A protein has these predicted regions:
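Formylglycine-dependent sulfatase
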Residues: 24-489, 493, 500-521, 525-551
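Bacterial N-terminal signal peptides
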Residues: 9-23
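N-terminal secretory signal peptides that target proteins for export/translocation
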Residues: 1-8
Length: 551
């Protein structure tokens, strides 16, 4: 009997001790329980540029994130810089919030968002988040008015070697008298790391959202000499060879299930600047001509441009590595969700602006102004057709890497669900347990089209979208399930089954006119709704945001 009583008492004592220990541990645990969020956005980076998406460019840090997390194979952007950024941070198509054009609606390309069109920080800050921005902005209004606590706004996107024109916390930067050693990609990472260090020192009890928007590898092709040297002769085999090699890697990885698109020899830049072509000299070509037909001077010039593009991506990855190192140093890495994507596909644009181009300057230096052009842009967008500004797959397809050690158990897996930058806001809100309000200062908030991707973090499921919709500068598209309707400006509709033909090589439009009619009706219905919204809310067709020229 004594043994039984002793045993019972011991069990009760152990249970009480366990409860006491649990209570003590809960009080001793760090205050931060919600995950931190970092979204890293590249600019004009092709679908296949990163090593983890088939590229030969050295991207060990992105590759490491991919090995430890997820790669999405059918993630989309809006095909252009500013519409993608507005959609990414709001959860709406850019046209719904006055941030891109609509058919037959004058102006409005870069209008002012409606009062209810809040950015993600406005929903996170009431939940205790600190919010930081480092890099390109390209959204209407001032950054701090968008809910961010700190910001480096890279307004100077025409010279990677100068801080002139940039702003910190919405106040103009005074550049150093001697800017030797300055490089924009490094400066963005420096600011991001400074924000993280300050957060660890002064706000460790709060979670954070950090939007890191690199301007690389957007033109002008400016890179550090030591980075260019890694790739100087790497691309002399030409764009056809580069596409074949990248496509082979993509198939081995299981990233694509399609053919390789044919090079469109007669498709050049989306805008014509003939004087710029002349100024760039005899090495420049504005079509993806057969590599073997180019002169030696042209081959060398084109390969050099691609080497600079690669150097810019390489350097961006190095700086991402420094940001990751800071997360680890402050013991935030495990519970930080890192997203990486690009704002549009690689660019076929060719122009000279800002400080102009000195043909005698070393390529990639501050006095040069070079653009990648359609040849190697086609290779960077392997295996897809077209480029930035078009809504064929090459213009709108982006890598999406998602990494979160504390929350995603899958390692190195692929996710094939069609998804879009409009899905980022609802994804984050679900991850951090924040309910989006139904109204803002008494004004109803319209339902947003984005859907949370959280179910796909656990397994490869399809996230249901009624459709995915595009319109930019007359280029238009709609995806419903595996069907895609697409047309370049002034061209008839093309119809593709993306399950087997994401390369968009075999249009079924003439064989399936009823499917074209069905999808066109859906595209038009959505477009009409967005036109009605744009015309019926302030800040649209006649408003401007003061952000300057097209990017």
């Amino acid at each position: 009997m004594k043994t039984i009583l002793f045993t019972s008492s011991l069990r009760i004592g152990i249970a009480m001790l366990s409860l006491l220990t649990a209570s003590l541990l809960s009080h001793a645990a760090p205050a931060v329980s919600k995950p931190n969020v970092i979204f890293i956005l590249a600019d004009d980076m092709g679908f296949s540029d990163a090593g983890c998406y088939g590229g030969e460019i050295a991207t060990p840090n992105l590759d490491s994130l991919a090995r430890g997390g997820l790669r999405f194979t059918q993630f989309y952007n809006t095909t252009r810089c500013w519409p993608t950024r507005g959609a990414l941070l709001s959860g709406y198509y850019a046209q719904q919030i006055h941030r891109d054009t609509l058919p037959d609606v004058p102006g409005g390309m870069r209008g002012v968002r409606q009062p209810w069109a809040r950015l993600l920080p406005d929903f996170l800050k009431p939940a205790g988040f600190r919010c930081y921005h480092s890099g390109k902005w390209h959204i209407d209004g001032k950054v701090l008015d968008g809910g961010f606590d700190r910001s480096l706004n890279m307004n100077n996107q025409g010279n990677y070697f100068s801080a002139a024109g940039n702003a910190i916390d919405d106040k103009p930067v005074k550049p150093a008298t001697n800017e030797s050693g300055y490089y924009a990609t490094i400066a963005i990472a420096d600011h991001a790391i400074d924000c993280l260090k300050d957060h660890a020192a002064n706000h460790a009890g709060q979670p954070f959202f950090h939007y890191v928007a690199f301007i690389a590898p957007h033109f002008p092709l400016h890179a550090l000499p030591q980075d260019i040297a890694k790739y100087r002769d790497k691309y002399l085999a030409g764009w056809e060879a580069m596409r074949e090699v990248r496509f082979g890697r993509q198939k081995e990885m299981g990233i694509v299930n399609t053919t390789l698109s044919a090079l469109e020899r007669n498709v050049g830049p989306p805008y014509a600047f003939p004087d710029a072509i002349k100024q760039l000299g005899p090495g420049e070509v504005n079509r993806p001509l057969p590599w073997g037909e180019l002169t030696e001077e042209q081959r060398r010039f084109q390969a050099t441009k691609m080497a600079i593009h690669a150097a810019m991506v390489d350097r961006m990855d190095q700086e991402i590595g420094r940001i990751i190192a800071q997360l680890k140093a402050m013991k935030a890495y495990e519970n930080t969700i890192i997203f990486f994507a690009s704002d549009n596909g690689a660019s076929a644009e060719m122009m000279i602006r800002d400080g102009g181009h000195d043909p005698q300057a070393p390529p990639g230096s501050a006095k040069s102004y070079l653009c990648l052009g359609p040849g190697f842009s086609s290779a960077c967008n392997t295996p897809f057709r077209r480029h930035k500004t078009w809504v064929h797959e090459g213009g709108i397809s982006t890598p999406l890497v998602v990494h979160w050690p504390a929350g995603i158990s899958a390692k190195g897996e692929l996710r094939h669900t069609p998804s879009h930058v409009i899905d980022f806001v609802p994804t984050v809100l679900e991850l951090v347990g924040v309910q989006k309000p139904k109204e803002w200062k008494g004004e109803p908030i319209p339902e947003a089209p984005g859907r949370s991707l959280v179910p796909a973090f656990a397994k490869d499921v399809t996230i249901p979208h009624e459709s995915l919709w595009w319109y930019h500068e007359g280029n238009r598209a709609l995806r419903v399930g595996d069907w895609k309707l697409v047309a370049a400006k002034g061209d008839p509709w093309e119809l593709y089954n993306l399950r087997t033909d994401r390369a968009e090589q075999n249009s079924l439009a003439t064989k399936m006119p009823e499917k074209v009619t069905e999808l066109e009706r859906t595209w038009q219905e959505q477009t009409d709704r967005y036109i009605q919204l744009a015309r019926g809310t302030p800040g649209g067709p006649t408003a401007t945001d003061g952000q300057g020229r097209k990017r």
